[in-house]
Amino acid sequence: MGLEEKLPSGFLLSTVESFAGYLRKGSVWPATFGLACCAIEMMATGAGRFDIARFGMEAFRASPRQADLMIVAGRVSQKMAPVLRQVYDQMAEPKWVLAMGVCASSGGMFNNYAVVQGVDHVVPVDIYLPGCPPRPEMLLNAILALHDKIQHTPLGVNRQEAVRAAEQAALAATPTIRMEGLLR
């Protein structure tokens, strides 16, 4: 994000990291990636009854270059997976991903060749939100959990190492379609 990449590891004090995290968690700009019925609940969260604006997220961004949170709401097909990855790569650092619903988290009831069995095989996921579809209150709770994670995320070199490790673990995981046992 600029200065923090140029600082050597361990240079910042923890209080400075906490303060930067506190400021970051209040200015999260989500990019919508609504693919199925979970997107309806995500839109309801932005309405007046649930008021996501109190967390500083009233404007959902249409451009990934203006967003730092991707909410993947719904199932991801094999043809949509490269598009999802491209949108993720275009987002500015630091960036976070929230998998909304069981379809985004694990493929849901669509356990076939055409659906990615969990969006974490394409991009690293920070928060998993269960439900089919999850209620807006659950999305708000997941956003609060993400705020806590953002506040305690390291800066600089430590952040880059953590992101690389999460991406390698996600891409090295066995796809659910190849697993045996209760899933098949």
UniProtKB/Swiss-Prot annotation:
Main localization (coarse): membrane
EC numbers: 7.1.1.-
Cell compartments where the protein resides: Cell membrane
Cofactor note: Binds 1 [4Fe-4S] cluster.
Cofactors (names): [4Fe-4S] cluster
Pfam families: Oxidored_q6 (PF01058)
Binding site for [4Fe-4S] cluster: 37-38, 103, 132
Topological type in the membrane: Peripheral membrane protein
PANTHER family linked: NADH DEHYDROGENASE, NADH DEHYDROGENASE [UBIQUINONE] IRON-SULFUR PROTEIN 7, MITOCHONDRIAL
NCBIfam families (UniProt xref): nuoB_fam (TIGR01957), PRK06411.1 (NF005012)
Protein name: NADH-quinone oxidoreductase subunit B
Species annotation: Nocardia farcinica (strain IFM 10152)
Encoding gene per record: nuoB
